[in-house]
């Protein structure tokens, strides 16, 4: 395993080279091992995914369960906010933030927080909300009310466990789009500098055009 930033194999020339036993995914135009770069770029994306998933699912589950069931008037406001957030593309938001003084603080963790908030308050909230409205009219909820159960207790103990699969399934899919959004913004240099797949694609195209053609195994 070579250093993903400054690693250079002096025994291999010229660069880029095709996949071999020494370099399973070949080298890029600067002589760096593509596999090492790929593995180094996976760590930040894993952190992004973890932050995005848990923040998004926490927001969507708590707000999506309690507000439609307990605060019905407030739910009308949140519904409009969520509908508006659906129209906002996370890659565009990252590009806008990256054009200012926020580039250095747009780390994978902070991007995961931003994307988790957008996803949790966006489509995921509406998905959980629709499930809560449907469940709140079922017989076991009415029975719990007749027995004197408080709304917060019913929402957290009876309704929330039922809607968890809805939130989990959507956030798992949404996290994938978060990775794509970060790679997209990184390709244009609008996020903090860190090894990632977006920069690998950028280097493959940019340096390849100057130093002997694009190495397509890097792009793949």
Please tell me what each predicted stretch does.
Residues 103, 115-119, 171-172, 211-220:
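C-terminal transmembrane helix and the adjacent membrane-cytosol boundary/short C-terminal tail
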Residues 86, 100, 181-220:
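Glycine-rich helix-loop "coupling/hinge" segments at transmembrane-helix boundaries
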Residues 43-59, 152-185:
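Transmembrane alpha-helices
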Residues 27-32, 70, 143-162:
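Short helix-to-coil transition segments within interhelical loops
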Residues 65, 95-99, 111, 142, ...:
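Transmembrane alpha-helix boundary and packing residues in multipass membrane permease domains
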Residues 1-61, 65-66, 72-76, 87-91, ...:
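Gly/Trp-centered helix-boundary motif
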Residues 125-145, 150-151:
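Membrane-helix/interface signature in polytopic inner-membrane proteins
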Residues 24, 28, 32, 55, ...:
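Generic hydrophobic transmembrane alpha-helix motif, especially the helices
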């Amino acid at each position: 395993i070579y250093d993903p930033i400054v690693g250079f194999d002096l025994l291999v020339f010229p660069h880029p080279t095709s996949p071999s036993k020494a370099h399973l995914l070949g080298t890029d135009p600067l002589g760096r091992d593509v596999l090492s770069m790929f593995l180094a770029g996976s760590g930040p994306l894993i952190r992004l995914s973890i932050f995005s998933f848990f923040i998004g699912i926490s927001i969507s589950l708590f707000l999506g369960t309690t507000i439609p069931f307990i605060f019905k008037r407030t739910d009308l406001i949140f519904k409009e906010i969520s509908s508006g957030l659906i129209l906002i593309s996370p890659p565009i938001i990252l590009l806008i933030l990256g054009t200012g003084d926020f580039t250095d603080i747009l780390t994978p963790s902070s991007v995961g927080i931003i994307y988790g908030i957008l996803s949790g308050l966006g489509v995921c909230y509406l998905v959980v909300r629709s499930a809560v409205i449907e469940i709140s009219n079922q017989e076991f909820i009415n029975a719990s009310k007749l027995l004197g159960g408080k709304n917060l207790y019913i929402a957290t103990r009876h309704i929330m466990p039922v809607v968890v699969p809805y939130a989990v399934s959507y956030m798992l899919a949404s996290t994938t789009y978060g990775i794509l959004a970060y790679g997209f913004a990184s390709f244009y240099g609008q996020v903090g500098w860190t090894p990632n797949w977006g920069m690998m694609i950028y280097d493959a195209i940019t340096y390849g055009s100057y130093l002997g053609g694009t190495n397509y195994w890097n792009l793949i």
